[in-house]
């Protein structure tokens, strides 16, 4: 009786609320409060402080109330700076960083990191290399000392190099088992064919077997220079303390290049082309289609990120069905077109890849390509203000939620100083997002998508992947 009474009371209360006429001004108040709160949150983000040592090494930090901190060294070095002969050297060096230094031989480095309860990590991309440690804020002096030892005093012992060859070769086998990784390597290989951006970060297996201590030392001496480095920190750190520690441990990093051979970026042209790797034994097809995108600092990036947010992403494990906000996701669910899809905007210094990747069964590839290109053409010709507003809100949410924790913030600081030369405040990102409207989005999408030659990579049972000329013809509409 009590439960039914509560139910009846709730229902009657709802009916009263529905009959009550509310002022439009009152209806707008929550939205106004939400907007004000978001704007205030942007203004309350801690300032990123940046200093430069005498040798050109940049020191940047964002202080917060966290009891932990993440500190890392970001270096302008990656597979784009490598040649066919030494491709993979940067990735090899990154692995050897954990295998001891001249001051901490063998596993002494890992033991010292574990003794303070810290986490040591490193990664390489096509343009950057990073070494980072997450630890308690009180251990900041030890963390900076360890990072300085890693980037300056790698032992590069012959025995460790030989051991690491097998480790890297096993990792490459594991990467080859990831169809998504393979497809994106294929996409770079065809889109930037004949240029350094076509090279994989790990390098070919023959290079891994052949690289010598001399090759690795030459690469380190050429690229690990102070003006190409950023020491970044986020969390419970004071900038002055970080600067003093950097001065103590990193001021000796050389800024002089041998024979004035300053590493430069080789221009990388984009080529509309395709790579197809058909394997009917695999259960699902992976396909990536991309046009040439803008570089990091290009202002068009914000508008294109809004466009990607409108198209969205999808996975068959999501709820929502045909009621998903993304038109492409709704069509994919209704027609059972794919297992998943995602949009991407991969930026480099002067170019990029802008497109989508999807996973589907063999008989759905043609339809998925058709609907994907239809969404691109629709954004070029008839994007509406309502969906642009939705895309902007999605981008705002992603921008803020991405910077949750000391490690993402530290990565953002290090990467931003290498790519933009500064850390762009969230308030500035918000103002750029706010400027985007439907007309701007249509113009920018037309510039990058409409009647452009795409790069296509397919892997798996891809017999039904349309011919390249047909895919190319889907990049424009005949409108009379």
Swiss-Prot record:
The gene is Uqcrc1. The modification N6-succinyllysine is found at residue 163. Component of the ubiquinol-cytochrome c oxidoreductase, a multisubunit transmembrane complex that is part of the mitochondrial electron transport chain which drives oxidative phosphorylation. It is found in: Mitochondrion inner membrane. Acetylation of Lys-138 is observed in liver mitochondria from fasted mice but not from fed mice. GO terms for molecular function: metal ion binding; protein-containing complex binding; ubiquitin protein ligase binding. Its main location: mitochondrion. The modification N6-acetyllysine is found at residues 111, 138, 163, 248. It comes from Mus musculus. The keyword Acetylation applies. Disruption phenotype: Results in early embryonic lethality. Gene3D superfamilies: Metalloenzyme, LuxS/M16 peptidase-like. The modification Phosphoserine is found at residue 212. Residues 1-34 form a transit peptide. Pfam families: Peptidase_M16, Peptidase_M16_C. Expressed in neurons and astrocytes of the cerebral cortex and hippocampus (at protein level). SUPFAM superfamilies: LuxS/MPP-like metallohydrolase. Keywords: Acetylation, Electron transport, Membrane, Mitochondrion, Mitochondrion inner membrane, Phosphoprotein, Respiratory chain, Transit peptide, Transport. Belongs to the peptidase M16 family. UQCRC1/QCR1 subfamily. It is a peripheral membrane protein. This is Cytochrome b-c1 complex subunit 1, mitochondrial. Transmembrane segments: none annotated.
């Amino acid at each position: 009786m009590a439960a039914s009474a509560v139910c009846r009371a709730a229902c009657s209360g709802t009916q009263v609320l529905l009959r009550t006429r509310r002022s439009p001004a009152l209806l707008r108040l929550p939205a106004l409060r939400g907007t004000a709160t978001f704007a205030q949150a942007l203004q309350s983000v801690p300032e990123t402080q940046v200093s430069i040592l005498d040798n050109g090494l940049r020191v940047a930090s964002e202080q917060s109330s966290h009891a932990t901190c993440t500190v890392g060294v970001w270096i302008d070095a990656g597979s784009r700076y490598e040649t066919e002969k030494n491709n993979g050297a940067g990735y090899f060096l990154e692995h050897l960083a954990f295998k001891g230094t001249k001051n901490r031989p063998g596993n002494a480095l890992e033991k010292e990191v574990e003794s303070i309860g810290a986490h040591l990590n490193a990664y390489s991309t096509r343009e950057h290399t990073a070494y980072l440690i997450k630890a308690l804020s009180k251990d900041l002096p030890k963390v900076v000392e360890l990072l300085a030892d890693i980037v300056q005093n790698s032992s590069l012992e012959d025995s460790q190099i030989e051991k690491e060859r097998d480790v890297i070769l096993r990792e490459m086998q594991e990467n080859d088992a990831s169809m998504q990784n393979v497809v994106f390597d294929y996409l770079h290989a065809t889109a930037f064919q004949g240029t350094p951006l076509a090279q994989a970060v790990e390098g070919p297996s023959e290079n891994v077997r052949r690289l010598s201590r001399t090759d690795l030392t030459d690469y380190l001496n050429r690229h690990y220079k102070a003006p190409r480095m950023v020491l970044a920190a986020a969390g419970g750190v004071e900038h002055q303390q970080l600067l003093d520690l950097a001065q103590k441990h990193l001021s000796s990093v050389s800024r002089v290049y041998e024979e004035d051979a300053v590493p430069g970026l080789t221009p990388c042209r984009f080529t509309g082309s395709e790579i197809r790797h058909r394997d009917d034994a695999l259960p699902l097809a992976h396909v990536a289609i991309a046009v040439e995108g803008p570089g990091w600092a290009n202002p068009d990036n914000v508008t294109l990120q809004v466009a990607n947010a409108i198209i969205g992403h999808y996975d068959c494990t999501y709820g929502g069905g045909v009621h998903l906000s993304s038109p492409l996701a709704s069509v994919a669910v209704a027609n059972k077109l794919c297992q998943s899809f995602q949009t991407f905007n991969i930026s480099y210094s002067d170019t990029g890849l802008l497109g989508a990747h999807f996973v589907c069964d063999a008989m759905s590839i043609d339809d998925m390509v058709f609907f994907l290109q239809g969404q691109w053409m629709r954004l070029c010709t008839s994007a509406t203000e309502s969906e642009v507003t939705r895309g902007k809100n999605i981008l705002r949410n992603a921008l803020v939620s991405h910077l949750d924790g000391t490690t993402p913030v530290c990565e953002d600081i290090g990467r931003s100083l290498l790519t933009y030369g500064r850390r762009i405040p969230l308030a500035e990102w918000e103002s750029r997002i706010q400027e985007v409207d439907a007309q701007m989005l249509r113009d920018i999408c037309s510039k990058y998508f409409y009647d452009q030659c795409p790069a296509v990579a397919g892997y798996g049972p891809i017999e039904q992947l349309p011919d390249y000329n047909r895919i190319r013809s889907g990049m424009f509409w005949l409108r009379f």
